[in-house]
Regions:
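Membrane-interface helical sensory segment of bacterial ECF anti-sigma factor regulators
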Residues: 1-25
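Residues that form generic nucleotide/phosphate-binding pockets
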Residues: 6, 10, 61-64, 175-178
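Short extracytoplasmic
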Residues: 17-42
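Short, solvent-exposed recognition patches
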Residues: 34-147, 151
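Surface-exposed amphipathic alpha-helical segments
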Residues: 157-181
Length: 181
């Protein structure tokens, strides 16, 4: 998708994707009907054991929701998945993965809508200035700061994703690159 295909707008403090018309294509199983089953954190001795067991479950769940590449395959060294937040919606399904890393946290969010026409307008807070477009595989990823953290947001068909946290712009780009590797 080009900048013209995914219309965006921003002000001094927010960034938003604008509504778009759908292609009419819908998956056989709608994301709103998804019901993945993730192991509870309490079942594991520590974050490392949880991360090693649950991340493959997350990958399988995302693969069942969309065939589009959305999850990074590279994370900063020492990153551990510590929490999975699920949000089944009438018009889709949302997952937020919370990682611990270097005494802080960062998040990976994936929202898969039933169709492009059902995509909500999401607002992302940002610092003054223009977001930096980072285009790979004809998909525009928008990188911006928000206070002392950085984020990247993008849409790929009926999927909206974000990376947010105490990550450098180079780390965000490396994570984005790994999605399509």
């Amino acid at each position: 998708q080009s900048l013209l295909e995914t219309l965006v707008t921003w002000t001094g403090s927010t960034f938003s994707f604008l509504p778009q018309e759908g292609t009419g294509e819908e998956p056989a199983t709608l994301p709103s009907q998804a019901d993945p089953d993730f192991s509870p954190r309490e079942a594991f001795a520590d974050d490392e054991a949880y991360s090693e067991a649950v991340y493959p479950q997350v990958q399988a769940a995302v693969a069942s929701l969309t065939d589009r590449p959305v999850l990074p395959t590279w994370y900063p060294e020492g990153s551990l998945l510590t929490r999975v937040e699920e949000n089944p919606m009438d018009d889709g399904y949302s997952l937020t993965l919370v990682f611990s890393w270097d005494h802080t946290e960062f998040m990976v969010s994936v929202t898969v809508y039933n169709s492009e026409a059902e995509m909500d307008i999401q607002h992302y807070e940002k610092n003054e200035g223009n977001p930096e477009p980072y285009t790979i595989h004809n998909i525009s990823h928008y990188i911006m700061g928000n206070m002392d953290r950085n984020s990247a947001v993008w849409r790929n068909g009926p999927v909206e994703c974000s990376l947010r946290g105490s990550l450098t712009v180079d780390q965000l780009k490396q994570m984005i690159d790994s999605i399509y590797a």
